């Protein structure tokens, strides 16, 4: 064992790391040890020693390095380092010195000490001075702290003597022997880094650039003379504090680096500036210099920016001329100055600079910043920014003649105002020129598709003679000349629009009429398909005798006189768009599809005589009005979110819509009534195909929604969905003997078309998927449960289904008539649908106006249909079709005459806030308040009674009744139904509804075994599948139960007693034996969760029905759940 004692003096430790390494290597040359261990020791000493005082009076520091014979080093240097760190912290805090090893932390504490008024040593007098009062550390506090530290260190040293070896894989530099020591070391490092980050954040942004230049100069040029080491992470604030204190000349006791790092002199005591010296790097602290220093050629750091009250004279070799903080007067201009004038403190405008004799230099980047100038600067010829903000309101001089490759000469519109017109501008027509007609354009060319470019969002450009936008909005007030006869291949000649610029004009352009002409009616023409232009959004159109949309919303409550018979050549008398609406007149029923213009405008193409109609894909918002077609195709789009398309054909027996994104709608016009299929266009594209004469309809795969409606139904089922969360599918068939609905997630709807009235199936799309199967003549029908919606199905009413929903989230209302063979009420989100039967098949479909306000009018027997206006009503007319406005729906109607055969719905739509008052002849017998109480028993069921069960309560189901068709509420859906009649050929749905995860096993006598749930119970059904299977598999366990009760019980009882006597935990075997019975309890719990609310009802049915073997098995599993004491009583008996 070789021990080497190295004596390290403060002067020796004040050297840098290289010198320390060399001297230590010279001292240990005689010792034969590996160099790596010695290098670790030297690095430890160099990293952890403190330069400065003599460690509180201790002149010597002994470091013992022990080398064993196996060349493994045992170092006790960390104990010495702990002593040194604590003592230096104590005594340096008293002397005004910082005990941190990091320069950033020392600088930060130096600033803090200066604020607190700690004493420091003056640079000239070498005496301790105090600028102002502050907290001071006394000697008594230091002694007390020192004694405490010594006691603590002795305990640690005594503890460390036990462990004398260090693992060879541990690092010596900063490594601790235990996890606790390592954690303490890491915490200290983290605190040091936090102090550095906090200090860096204190630097103001205005001083960062100049101070960074000081760092570079001090580190690169003045490293040796100043004694500052080259540290790249040295920030500007630390260097600034060092530069503010000039170090004294080096002595034997104190080194240059020691004096420069100690920060002995505060800047308050310097009343006069020091004379400049050539070898002084830190010239003058910035706090107390009242007069500027004379310039020096070799001085890099001229003047700090705080207290210079007068500007310094310019110099050619000065990099940072003048900081911007304290200049009360502007500096004279300088040709070679990089930063001409800072913008902070200029109270007066700068004088105009003369034209430079020399060309501008590349280093003259920042001429004058414009933030702090109170007056504008004079113009200059060599200014890069030609037009300041004030010049934007004045017209520009005319530009050069246009070139062939110049598409758009005028840049983007200015937010303040339009640019002046120019001759060579492509976008020629500003908003002012739209009020006057344009001169006739050149003869059209064959390749001219679209003459009007996309609208500008901010404002129009000035007009020009050769503008591509030939027809402004004012030209719509005059009729267009007749176009050439249509050709076979001329369906829609307009390709996709350009988003940025217009297409060249042509004579055979399809877009003949822009949107501004819609405000007034066009003169009638023989070949004109559209007699009346679209409605104005702001105000109603003037009344006309031949107008189809005659009655505003106020006149709907009074019957209108019969209108004139339709004529053969009258196709569309009044197309109305609010913001988009199209109404066909010659169709026996009309689909009015207006949409919300802001969020999701939609497209509609209505063709009459075309045998094949194909909807093109459009992007942005064009409006194409084809005049060669006998009907009009209006195609407006929403450019931001998703364009939409609709194709409505009249004479096509079979229409197939191609792939549309995000929406497609194809409606075949052989249907006596129209199915309105609106969708939510934001998230997912939707597709719908409705066919009438196809005997077998198969829906392909649609994502996210699919809908196939077979048109053998005398009435139409409207199946709208909420497309946000989940895709949906619907298959509705009436006369098809085998129709199977594929897998649906999260909603499924199967409607059997034996009902002479329409089944309305609304869903709540946000929270839970829902499923509903409604059948009339099927002997076993199960009604689904809805949350948070409610469905009221009146039985004694002549088929009126009132479907109100949760008003907060999705306020919807639906009234469905029974005796209308061809009226379909669609369900919208969050919308309201009212289908009136008293009108000759007019369906008024208003919706929620905030999110997606839409309107649909479906007519059956009316040759002309009128759509409602959202903004304002149209003037009344004699032949108006719309009888009931939306305002009168909120008040109760007077009692009507006794019901007649053609009277479908006598009660207007329900109020969103509350129900209507009851009346004797009211079809909706049960208002929303009556839903919480059971209904009185009704008359015996009749053959024409469709749905006998009223709507479920939001909180719970209504009590059952004998004459109720929907026998099983949502809770009873999990129990088997009584055996139904043998299946017939006309039975539509033979397979029970699919479950969300997987279908239940089929049963021969069960039509709808397990209808799916729509609420939170749907999630509970997921584990029910394996549970039911396990219950079926565990059917043999009841036999061993019987054996245990009769045979093995006497033998098991003494076994239990012995286990209780021998084992300390006697209840444990008892629990285990109870757990033996648990396999039967588990299915009991599962089935009990399924039938919890309606446990007595399935018992009654099970007792009376006595179904096949499968059902009693299920009964046993279900009977044991609520009646656990019953098997116990049997065992006791």
UniProtKB/Swiss-Prot annotation:
UniProt biased composition (Polar residues): 252-262
Protein transport keyword on record: no
Assigned protein family: Belongs to the NPIP family.
A GO cellular-component term linked to this record: membrane
Region (Disordered): 241-262, 290-575, 868-1133
InterPro entries referenced in this protein's UniProt entry, alphabetically: NPB13-like_MII_rpt, NPIP, NPIP_N
Pfam families given in the database record: NPB13-l_MII_rpt, NPIP
Composition-biased stretches (Basic and acidic residues): 406-416, 448-458, 490-500, 528-538, 903-913, 945-955, 987-997
Alphabetical keyword list: Membrane, Transmembrane, Transmembrane helix
Broad class of the protein's primary localization: membrane
Protein name: Nuclear pore complex-interacting protein family member B5
Skewed-composition ranges (Pro residues): 349-359
Residue stretches spanning the membrane: 60-84
Membrane topology: Single-pass membrane protein
Keyword Membrane (UniProt): yes
Name of the gene this protein is made from: NPIPB5
Organism: Homo sapiens
Annotated localization: Membrane
Lineage: Eukaryota, Metazoa, Chordata, Craniata, Vertebrata
């Amino acid at each position: 064992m070789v021990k080497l004692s190295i004596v390290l003096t403060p002067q020796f430790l004040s050297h840098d790391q290289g010198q320390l390494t060399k001297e230590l290597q010279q001292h240990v040359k005689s010792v034969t040890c590996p160099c790596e261990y010695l290098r670790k020791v030297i690095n430890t000493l160099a990293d952890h020693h403190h330069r400065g005082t003599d460690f509180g009076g201790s002149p010597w520091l002994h470091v013992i390095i022990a080398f064993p014979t196996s060349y493994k080093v045992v170092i006790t240097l960390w104990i010495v380092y702990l002593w040194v760190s604590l003592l230096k912290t104590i005594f340096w805090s008293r002397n005004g010195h910082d005990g941190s090893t990091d320069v950033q932390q020392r600088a930060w504490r130096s600033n803090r000490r200066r604020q607190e008024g700690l004493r420091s040593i003056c640079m000239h007098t070498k005496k301790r001075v105090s600028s102002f009062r502050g907290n001071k550390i006394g000697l008594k506090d230091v002694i007390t702290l020192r004694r405490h530290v010594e006691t603590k260190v002795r305990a640690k040293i005594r503890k460390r003597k036990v462990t004398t070896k260090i693992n060879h894989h541990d690092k010596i530099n900063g490594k601790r022997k235990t996890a606790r020591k390592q954690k303490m070391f890491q915490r200290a490092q983290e605190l040091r880094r936090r102090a550095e980050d906090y200090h860096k954040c204190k630097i103001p942004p205005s001083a960062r650039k100049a101070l960074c230049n000081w760092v570079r100069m001090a580190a690169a040029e003045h490293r040796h003379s100043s004694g500052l080491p080259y540290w790249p992470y040295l920030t500007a604030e630390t260097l600034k504090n060092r530069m503010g204190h000039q170090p004294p000349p080096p002595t034997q006791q104190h080194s240059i680096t020691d004096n420069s790092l100690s920060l002995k002199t505060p800047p308050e005591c310097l009343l006069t500036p020091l004379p400049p010296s050539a070898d002084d790097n830190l010239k003058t602290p910035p706090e107390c210099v009242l007069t500027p220093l004379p310039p020096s050629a070799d001085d890099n750091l001229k003047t700090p920016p705080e207290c210079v009250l007068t500007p310094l004279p310019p110099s050619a070799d000065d990099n940072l001329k003048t900081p911007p903080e304290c200049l009360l007067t502007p500096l004279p201009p300088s040709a070679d100055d990089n930063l001409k004038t800072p913008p902070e403190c200029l109270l007066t405008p700068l004088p105009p600079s003369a034209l430079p004799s020399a060309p501008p230099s590349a280093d003259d980047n920042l001429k004058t910043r414009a933030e702090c100038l109170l007056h504008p600067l004079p113009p200059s010829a060599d200014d890069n920014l030609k037009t300041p903000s004030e010049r934007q309101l004045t017209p520009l001089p005319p530009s050069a003649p246009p070139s062939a490759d110049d598409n758009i000469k005028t840049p983007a519109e200015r937010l303040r105002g339009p640019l002046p017109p120019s001759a060579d501008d492509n976008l020629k027509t500003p908003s002012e020129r739209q009020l006057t007609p344009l001169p006739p354009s050149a003869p059209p060319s064959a390749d001219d598709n679209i003459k009007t470019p996309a609208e500008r969002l901010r404002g129009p450009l000035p007009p020009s003679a050769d503008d591509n936008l030939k027809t402004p909005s004012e030209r719509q007030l005059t009729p267009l000349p007749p176009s050439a006869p249509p050709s076979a291949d001329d369906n829609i000649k307009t390709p996709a629009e350009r988003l940025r610029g217009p297409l060249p004009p042509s004579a055979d352009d399809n877009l003949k009429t822009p949107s501004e002409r819609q405000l007034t009616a066009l003169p009638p023409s023989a070949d004109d398909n559209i007699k009346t232009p679209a409605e104005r959004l702001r105000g109603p159109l003037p009344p006309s005798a031949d107008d189809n949309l005659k009655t505003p919303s106020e006149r709907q409550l009074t019957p209108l006189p019969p209108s004139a018979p339709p004529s053969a050549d009258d196709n569309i008398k009044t197309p109305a768009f609010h913001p988009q609406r199209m109404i066909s007149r010659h169709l026996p029923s009309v689909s009015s599809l207006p949409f919300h213009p802001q969020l999701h405008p939609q497209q509609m193409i209505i063709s009459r005589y075309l045998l094949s109609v194909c909807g093109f894909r459009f992007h942005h918002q064009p409006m194409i009005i084809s005049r060669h077609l006998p009907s009009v195709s209006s195609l407006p789009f929403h450019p931001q979110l998703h364009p939409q398309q609709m194709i409505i054909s009249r004479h096509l027996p079979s229409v197939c819509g191609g792939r549309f994104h995000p929406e497609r709608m194809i409606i075949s016009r052989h249907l006596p009534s129209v199915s309105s299929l609106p969708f939510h266009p934001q998230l997912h594209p939707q597709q719908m195909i409705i066919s009438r004469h196809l005997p077998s309809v198969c829906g392909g795969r649609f994502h996210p929604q699919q809908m196939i409606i077979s048109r053998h139904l005398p009435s139409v089922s409207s199946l709208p969905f909420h497309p946000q969360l989940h895709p949906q599918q619907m298959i509705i068939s009436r006369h098809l003997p085998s129709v199977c609905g594929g897998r649906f997630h999260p909603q499924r709807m199967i409607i059997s078309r034996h009902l002479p009235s329409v089944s309305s199936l609304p869903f709540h799309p946000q929270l839970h998927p829902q499923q509903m199967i409604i059948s009339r003549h099927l002997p076993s029908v199960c009604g689904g449960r809805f949350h948070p919606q409610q469905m009221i199905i009146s039985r004694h009413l002549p088929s009126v289904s009132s479907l109100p929903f949760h008003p907060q989230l999705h306020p919807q209302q639906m009234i469905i008539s029974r005796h209308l063979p061809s009226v379909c009420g669609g369900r919208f989100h969050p919308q309201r649908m009212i289908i009136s039967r008293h009108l000759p098949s007019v369906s008024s479909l208003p919706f929620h106006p905030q999110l997606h306000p839409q309107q649909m009018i479906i007519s059956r027997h009316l040759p002309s249909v009128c759509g409602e206006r959202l903004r304002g009503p149209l003037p009344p007319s004699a032949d108006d079709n719309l009888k009931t406005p939306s305002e009168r729906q909120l008040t109760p109607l007077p009692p009507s005459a006794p019901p007649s055969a053609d009277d479908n719905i006598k009660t207007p739509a329900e109020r969103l806030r509350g129900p209507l008052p009851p009346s004797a002849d009211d079809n909706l017998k049960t208002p929303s308040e009556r839903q919480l109480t059971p209904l009185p028993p009704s008359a015996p069921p009749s053959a024409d009674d469709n749905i006998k069960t009223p709507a479920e309560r939001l909180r719970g189901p209504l009590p059952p009744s004998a004459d109720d068709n929907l026998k099983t509420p949502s809770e009873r859906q999990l129990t088997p139904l009584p055996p139904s009649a043998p299946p017939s050929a006309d039975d539509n749905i033979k397979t029970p509804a699919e479950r969300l995860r997987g279908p239940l096993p089929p049963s021969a006598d069960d039509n709808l075994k397990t209808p799916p749930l729509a609420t939170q119970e749907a999630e509970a059904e997921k584990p029910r599948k394996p549970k039911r299977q396990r219950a079926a598999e565990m059917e043999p366990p009841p036999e061993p139960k019987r054996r245990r009760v009769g045979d093995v019980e006497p033998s098991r009882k003494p076994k239990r007693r012995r286990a209780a006597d021998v084992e300390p935990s006697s209840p444990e075997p008892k629990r285990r034996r109870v757990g033996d019975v648990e396999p039967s309890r588990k299915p009991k719990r599962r089935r009990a969760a399924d039938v919890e609310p309606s446990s007595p009802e399935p018992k009654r049915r099970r007792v009376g029905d006595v179904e096949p073997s499968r059902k009693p098995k299920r009964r046993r599993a279900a009977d044991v759940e609520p009646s656990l004491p019953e098997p116990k009583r049997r065992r006791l008996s």
